[in-house]
Amino acid sequence: EEIGGLALKTDVSVEADIVRLVNEAEKQFGPIDVFCSNAGVADQDEPDGTAASCSNENWLKAWQINVMAHVYAARAVLPGMIARKQGYLLNTVSAAGLLNQIGAASYSTTKHAAIGFAEALAITHGDDGIKVSVVCPQAVATQMLPDFDDGGPQGLDGILAPEDVADSIVAGLAEESFLILPHERVSLYMQRKASDYDRWLNGMRRLRSSFISTPPGK
């Protein structure tokens, strides 16, 4: 209230909640110029550590929050943005959607899907005046980070403060960049993956083995 904002409890996995959020925001403030879709959820490959071991319930939860929440948001705001011939969709995804996250298959898979949807938005609606950006950090100091000091495999290139990620986002929006990479080395990893997929997979296997043989935080 102090900054003139509006806070609404919203379950982003429920489309009706997002529609209500958009309607209430536009009722109070007018048309939405920028919609930031930021919610995410991550689960580890448990209980047995295989890539398919995460429960069906957690797979579906990841799909609803990491993918469908972006779909629901776009569905709610696109008609108005297209009519006005302007608008910006900013989706928080993850470097896991460009590369992979060791030990979190449901997270990596749904983040790849989120990237694909954002690409479809940019391709389909760029000529409608709609801008799209995806934010793809590695480890960020939030409650989603695994419970050990170094952040695990995703903390290999350092753990960023939320404020640092925010600065990257502001710069990326100013440049209207589709891909916003707070950890700059992710771009290099993408190039290596694209240039030799098998070599990249072998490298990821070695990285996984090193973390299995070394206890977290050591």
Residue ranges and their predicted role:
Residues 74, 110:
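Active-site helix of classical SDR
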Residues 99, 120-131:
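Active-site-adjacent segment of SDR/Rossmann-fold oxidoreductases
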Residues 10-21, 56:
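The beta1-alpha1 cofactor-binding region of Rossmann-like NAD(H)/NADP(H)-dependent oxidoreductases
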Residues 94:
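Residue(s) in the substrate-gating loop at a strand-loop-helix junction
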Residues 46-51, 55-60:
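Substrate-binding pocket helix/loop in short-chain dehydrogenase/reductase
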Residues 3-6, 24-35, 43:
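A glycine-rich helix->loop->beta "capping" turn
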Residues 151-152, 156-218:
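C-terminal tail/cap regions
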